[in-house]
């Protein structure tokens, strides 16, 4: 590959240390796809003869068949996926195979491979996200009036519906989907034709290659095209935010499954037991997703640290970009697959959720709002309700269980109709506006969600 310049062979340890074929063979299909497009462009531009290109393309198809059949012999001595493919191509078609690399460097070749691979993986991840969100919409629709506590500081705050809470998850994931769709636009720019760093002296037409490979744009500067990996960092950043959201969801499910909450049940197939405690049903799937978020965060830091001090253009450091990206994609894909199957099958324990809501004076804000509508300043209403809650705590009862006389001792603005506003159902129904937890609003949110998901179909 470069023997003409050197006076001695590469040290065997160095050859193994610098080889990437152990992991970048994952790009084989995309590498061959890019080579076929490159060869076709060379023919269209009159740089290679049509017969030679036909021979090269036939040979590349044979190489791909061997790889897919598991019959390909990968060689560390050939360093990477590119040289392994090219060497086998030359074995098959002879010296004409050596013409394939005309007007191309491994620098723009690998940058193209990464983008082709990541574009495909991004599409797969978006499809999984849409599937997961569709399942959440189904779950939310079933529970628009299933009452549960809404929390702040993990303390009971106000009543919400389980469906409303699930729709909060949906909104998080929807923004994640938008981020990935937006990142895909920058992934889908073609670096091929940039050669090593300065372009090529051959009269190539990059628009031909871009069209053949489905790129929507062409990298405008050859130095930038071969040396930056910001598109991979952006993807990993979006993946990190997504995993953060899934980790938060996991934490809630883990808490809700505990005996202390007992809000939800997860089907047994998503749980494991204990080797010593026969009673245990452990939420391993959400626990692992919560843990795997740390891996994705770490890969983002790896890529940022990898790029932070590199001068233009390509450096061998960039060989280290692949394994973090592979791990990020694999971890995210596995987590989404698990969630897409598990989350829509969660069963809420309605009675326990309702009972928990009754314990926390969740309608206190409703009583304050009631007083405000009767002319009491909010800060005064806040104090009145605080006193009423203190009495409820002392008596061991909910606000709705206090008598009218007990409530009126704190404010003469309280009338007999107050109890209509202290029911959990009344509290939900009162929040009847866009984004509110009223059952009707949650139903509308689900309907809008289905329409919005169609944008990603």
Curated annotation (Swiss-Prot):
Enzyme Commission (EC) number: 4.3.2.1
Catalytic activity: 2-(N(omega)-L-arginino)succinate = fumarate + L-arginine
Subcellular location: Cytoplasm
CDD domains according to UniProt: Argininosuccinate_lyase
Chief location bin: cytoplasm
InterPro entries: Arg_succ_lyase_C (IPR029419), Argininosuccinate_lyase (IPR009049), Fumarase/histidase_N (IPR024083), Fumarate_lyase_CS (IPR020557), Fumarate_lyase_fam (IPR000362), Fumarate_lyase_N (IPR022761), L-Aspartase-like (IPR008948)
Swiss-Prot/TrEMBL keywords: Amino-acid biosynthesis, Arginine biosynthesis, Cytoplasm, Lyase
GO cellular component labels: cytosol
Enzyme kind, highest EC tier: lyase
Annotated metabolic or biological route of this protein: Amino-acid biosynthesis; L-arginine biosynthesis; L-arginine from L-ornithine and carbamoyl phosphate: step 3/3
Pfam families: ASL_C2 (PF14698), Lyase_1 (PF00206)
Family from the record: Belongs to the lyase 1 family. Argininosuccinate lyase subfamily.
Alphabetical list of PANTHER family matching this protein: ARGININOSUCCINATE LYASE
Protein name: Argininosuccinate lyase
Native source species: Psychrobacter cryohalolentis (strain ATCC BAA-1226 / DSM 17306 / VKM B-2378 / K5)
Lineage of origin: Bacteria, Pseudomonadati, Pseudomonadota, Gammaproteobacteria, Moraxellales
């Amino acid at each position: 590959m470069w023997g003409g310049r050197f006076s001695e062979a590469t040290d065997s340890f160095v050859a193994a240390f610098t080889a990437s074929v152990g992991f970048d063979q994952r790009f084989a299909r995309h590498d061959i796809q890019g080579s076929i497009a490159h060869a076709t462009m060379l023919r269209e531009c009159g740089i290679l003869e049509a017969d030679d290109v036909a021979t090269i393309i036939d040979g590349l198809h044979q190489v791909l068949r061997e790889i897919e059949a598991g019959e390909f012999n990968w060689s560390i001595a050939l360093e990477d996926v590119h040289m392994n493919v090219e060497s086998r191509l030359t074995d098959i078609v002879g010296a004409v195979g050596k013409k394939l690399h005309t007007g191309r460097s491994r620098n723009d070749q690998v940058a193209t491979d990464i983008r082709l691979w990541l574009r495909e993986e991004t599409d797969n991840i978006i499809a999984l996200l849409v599937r997961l969100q569709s399942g959440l919409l189904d779950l939310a629709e079933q529970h628009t009036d299933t009452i549960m506590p809404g929390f702040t500081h993990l303390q009971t705050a106000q009543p919400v519906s389980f469906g409303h809470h699930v729709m909060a998850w949906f909104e998080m994931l929807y923004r994640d989907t938008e981020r990935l769709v937006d990142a895909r636009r920058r992934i889908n720019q073609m670096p091929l034709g940039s050669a090593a760093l300065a372009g090529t002296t051959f009269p190539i037409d990059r628009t031909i290659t871009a069209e053949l490979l489905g790129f929507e744009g062409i990298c405008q500067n050859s130095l930038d095209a071969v040396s930056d990996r910001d598109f991979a960092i952006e993807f990993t950043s979006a993946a990190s935010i997504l995993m953060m959201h899934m980790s938060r969801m996991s934490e809630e499910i883990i808490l809700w499954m505990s005996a202390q909450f007992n809000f939800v049940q997860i089907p047994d197939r998503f749980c494991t037991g204990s080797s010593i405690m026969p009673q245990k049903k452990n939420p391993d799937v959400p626990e692992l997703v919560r843990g795997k978020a740390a891996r994705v965060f770490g890969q983002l830091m790896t890529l940022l640290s990898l790029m932070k001090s590199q001068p233009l253009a390509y450096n061998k450091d960039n060989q280290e970009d692949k394994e973090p990206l592979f791990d990020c994609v694999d971890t995210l894909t596995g987590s989404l697959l698990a969630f897409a199957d598990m989350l829509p099958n969660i069963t809420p324990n309605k009675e326990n959720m309702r009972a928990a809501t009754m314990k926390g004076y969740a309608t206190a804000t409703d009583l304050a709002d009631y007083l405000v509508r009767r002319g009491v300043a909010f800060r005064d209403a806040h104090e009145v309700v605080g006193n009423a809650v203190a009495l409820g705590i002392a008596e061991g009862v909910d606000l709705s269980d206090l008598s009218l006389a007990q409530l009126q001792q704190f404010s003469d603005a309280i009338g007999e109709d107050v109890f209509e506003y202290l029911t959990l159902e009344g509290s939900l129904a009162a929040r009847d506006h866009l984004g509110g937890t009223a059952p009707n609003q949650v139903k509308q949110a689900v309907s809008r969600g289905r329409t919005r998901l169609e944008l990603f179909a």
